[in-house]
Amino acid sequence: MFNIISKKYTQALVDSGSNLDETLSILKGLSLALKDKRNADIIASPFLSKTQKEQFLLESVGKVDMKLQNFFRLLAQSDRILLIPYISDELERRLLARKKEYAATLTAKESLDTKTLEKIQDSLAKKLGVKLSIKQRLSEVDGIKLSVEDLGIEVSFSKERFSNDLKHHILKAL
């Protein structure tokens, strides 16, 4: 739900003609600030008026151009300040897509060393003909999964599934 709404706000930012790289850095800073429980509680507080939340937000970003100020005012008046991390992520995806750069997520049970990550990154980037950066995420699942969400690519290998398929194939052969 938040992703759908954030895409509309992101499109408004893209259409506004503002410096998108600068806007992205401001949004990332706000996203980090909103991860702090105290700041998120202030924004979500029913005891503060929308005007007070707007002032808090505008003071947090400092001096920005008028279009961006109006954007933040709109977010505050619409009670959408907590969408800023989603807007930031969507804007980052769009900017990377313009540059033919994509972010991939590698999910594994154990952390892989940087050399292995670079090999995977280089070979996949070469195959797809794009720039690629891999972020690693740890999981409890015994296997490995690589996904490039923006390109609709997902490759996974599960130890349990492999084992089950092997057993099934052996039983079928007998």
UniProtKB/Swiss-Prot annotation:
Question: What GO MF terms are annotated?
Answer: proton-transporting ATP synthase activity, rotational mechanism
* Family annotation (InterPro entries): ATP_synth_OSCP/delta_N_sf, ATPase_OSCP/dsu
Cellular localization per UniProt: Cell inner membrane
**How does the protein associate with the membrane?**
Peripheral membrane protein
SUPFAM superfamilies per record: N-terminal domain of the delta subunit of the F1F0-ATP synthase
One GO location term (cellular component) = proton-transporting ATP synthase complex
Q: Which domain of life is it from?
A: Bacteria
S-adenosyl-L-methionine among the record's keywords? no
Q: Which UniProt keywords apply?
A: ATP synthesis, Cell inner membrane, Cell membrane, CF(1), Hydrogen ion transport, Ion transport, Membrane, Transport
Q: Determine if Metal-binding is one of this entry's keywords.
A: no
Question: Pfam family example for this protein?
Answer: OSCP
Primary role: F(1)F(0) ATP synthase produces ATP from ADP in the presence of a proton or sodium gradient. F-type ATPases consist of two structural domains, F(1) containing the extramembraneous catalytic core and F(0) containing the membrane proton channel, linked together by a central stalk and a peripheral stalk. During catalysis, ATP synthesis in the catalytic domain of F(1) is coupled via a rotary mechanism of the central stalk subunits to proton translocation.
Q: Indicate the family of this protein.
A: Belongs to the ATPase delta chain family.
UniProt subunit comment = F-type ATPases have 2 components, F(1) - the catalytic core - and F(0) - the membrane proton channel. F(1) has five subunits: alpha(3), beta(3), gamma(1), delta(1), epsilon(1). F(0) has three main subunits: a(1), b(2) and c(10-14). The alpha and beta chains form an alternating ring which encloses part of the gamma chain. F(1) is attached to F(0) by a central stalk formed by the gamma and epsilon chains, while a peripheral stalk is formed by the delta and b chains.
* Name this protein carries in UniProt: ATP synthase subunit delta
